[in-house]
């Protein structure tokens, strides 16, 4: 037998109330007396219900007081509902039972006897009704125009006082409103359901109009056909832009999601695994709703444009593929324009080509080491190994880079620095060094000219001495010279001129061919000799 007693209300003696007839028959048939379980009134007792097991067998329960039958309310088909004399009005909060730990002390207690299978079915139905925002008749909560009361028999005995204080708190409703604003998706789901209902009503109305009279459909089809090519192109471009906007929204949402995951992982590394989930889940739900609303708005515009163009929904794969072809062309054109613009501004690298040389990161590390050791850019073996580890290159690659850098980069810089500091002196040295070979060349040329003059003088002397003997490169005597008069000055002048002609004509022939022309009869005679001219010069 189960009896309920109160603690802080006016107590008076009354007959106990039985939950079913079986317990009443057991109490009537039993003869053994037992002690009655009572709760004395006072402020020291907690303001909650105490469930007393059926142990009394007497006809009358004695005590300070029992609960009156007026405090117990039996709803038709709703189970037992008990209050302490006051109803707690709270804002509708559909997840008290599941989130705050409200559990039934004895779910099988009811006006009717229920099996455990029936209890499971009732619990499933109550969960579904709570998720749908409706009041569960079998639960302790009954919705009364947005307000309701919770039966305290649903609370745990250990947390009843705390829960009652929470439910009576003045901060409960603002907290519920804040959570509904940030997390709850119920309003938007209801709005989406209303939109779907409107769309279905519109579609059904349009179908009725098409079935009733074909004039409107023909007019609408005629309007879609009567579109000019310019208008059709404009609508097509608009549709392509809207489709690209949908792709951009999806891309941005994925980007946001990945960034949030990266941030959460970095936070969990510091704070612990799963510590970022309470923060990120709310933000993800909120942002996903914004993205979804934007995407739905763009989709509605696309649907309007399709209706203007007279296109269908494009559910089949062929139609979707036909839509993607012009959209891909548009995207390709846009990407090319952006790529050209970025290349002009220098924001993006050109297209990929086979890499020549080392990676830029490695080169930057090696160049930094070179400038740090600019006075002596010759790394040791240990330094080469260290640089190879830092750059991800091999030791030979590092050594080859430093060889090339010293030749192409370091040496020209040293030369420029030397020119800047010692530019005047180096120019003087260079001018002096350039003048010295010129002076030596001039001296050599002057000495050669002097030797040529001496040789010419000697040759003239040789030929002048030959005039006295009347023999020049020949063993035979010339009749003209023998018969001539030596005392005649005119004859002597002719002989000298002929000798000079022979000397001048010598330079026009080979080394071994010499020509002698007599001054008197101009007879030409040739002869060959193996001796050179300088052999005959004394």
UniProtKB/Swiss-Prot annotation:
It holds the Pfam family Homeobox_KN. Keywords: DNA-binding, Homeobox, Nucleus, Transcription, Transcription regulation. Residues 169-185 are annotated as: SR/KY domain. It is found in: Nucleus. Residues 351-413 bind DNA. Residues 201-223, 434-500 are annotated as: Disordered. Changing residue 218 to N: In strain: cv. Ag-0, cv. Bs-1, cv. Chi-1, cv. Cvi-0, cv. Kas-1, cv. Ita-0, cv. Landsberg erecta, cv. Lisse, cv. Me-0, cv. Mt-0, cv. Oy-0. One of its GO terms (cellular component) is nucleus. Changing residue 233 to D: In strain: cv. Ag-0, cv. Bs-1, cv. Chi-1, cv. Cvi-0, cv. Kas-1, cv. Ita-0, cv. Landsberg erecta, cv. Lisse, cv. Me-0, cv. Mt-0, cv. Oy-0. GO terms for molecular function: DNA binding; DNA-binding transcription factor activity. Its main location: nucleus. Residues 461-476, 487-497 have a biased composition (Polar residues). Changing residue 236 to H: In strain: cv. Ag-0, cv. Bs-1, cv. Chi-1, cv. Cvi-0, cv. Kas-1, cv. Ita-0, cv. Landsberg erecta, cv. Lisse, cv. Me-0, cv. Mt-0, cv. Oy-0. InterPro entries: HD, Homeodomain-like_sf, KN_HD, POX_dom, TALE_homeobox. PROSITE patterns: HOMEOBOX_1 (PS00027), HOMEOBOX_2 (PS50071). The SR/KY and BELL domains are responsive for the interaction between the TALE/BELL proteins and the TALE/KNOX proteins. PANTHER family: HOMEOBOX PROTEIN TRANSCRIPTION FACTORS (PTHR11850). Interacts with TLP1. May form heterodimeric complexes with TALE/KNOX proteins. Interacts with OFP1, OFP2, OFP4 and OFP5. Belongs to the TALE/BELL homeobox family. This is BEL1-like homeodomain protein 10. It comes from Arabidopsis thaliana. The gene is BLH10.
